[in-house]
């Protein structure tokens, strides 16, 4: 049998690696997987999954940016605009611990690095994702539900600094599903919600 066309087409549709959300970042990167149906679907799922995970985590553990540079006690300088925990607006678990526990944790890195500034203040510096290091990404296969929260649900950030229930945060969690700003594919620029 010399008909190898069907095998070749199946391999092309499957692709040669996993589709990632970075493949959907631009028309150029999308060109690397275009025509590989399975990789396209995997990349779109990665976009959806990571957006949901980051949205939920950002509500439980909101970030803000520093307005000025600061230096840590070990001599490292952090520029203005460094992303840190928004301590004033974050919820806490019943133990009041900072930083609060994120719902989904990455397998290779904590959400924050605790840094003591030369000004005596404690900063919780957000550890950004590195697209080249999979264990730092919020992606399928590189995250898990926070084990502390699985063991003791009361550690979930649901309380204000004064100990009262943070109902506003609950409203933000519900509203996150209605935000219409996600684009799954560079060729489909119509924004959608998590539910669409």
Write out the residue ranges for each language-model feature.
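Structural signature of extracellular appendage/secretion-system components
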Residues: 1-196
């Amino acid at each position: 049998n010399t008909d190898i066309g069907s095998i070749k087409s199946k391999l092309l549709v499957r692709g040669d690696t996993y589709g990632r959300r970075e493949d959907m970042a631009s028309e150029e990167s999308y060109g690397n997987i275009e025509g590989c149906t399975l990789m396209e679907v995997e990349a779109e799922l990665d976009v959806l999954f990571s957006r949901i995970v980051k949205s939920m985590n950002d509500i439980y553990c909101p970030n803000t940016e520093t307005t000025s540079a600061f230096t840590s006690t070990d001599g490292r300088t952090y520029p203005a605009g460094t992303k840190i925990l928004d301590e004033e607006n974050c919820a806490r678990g019943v133990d009041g611990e900072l930083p609060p526990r994120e719902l989904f944790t990455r397998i290779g890195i904590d959400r924050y690095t605790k840094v003591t500034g030369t000004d005596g203040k404690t900063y919780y510096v957000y550890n950004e994702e590195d697209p080249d290091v999979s264990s730092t990404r919020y992606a399928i296969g590189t995250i898990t539900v926070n084990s502390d929260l699985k063991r003791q649900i009361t550690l979930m950030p649901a309380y204000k600094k004064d100990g009262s229930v943070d109902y506003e945060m609950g409203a933000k969690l519900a509203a996150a599903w209605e935000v219409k700003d996600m684009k799954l594919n560079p060729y489909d620029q119509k924004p959608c919600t998590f539910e669409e």
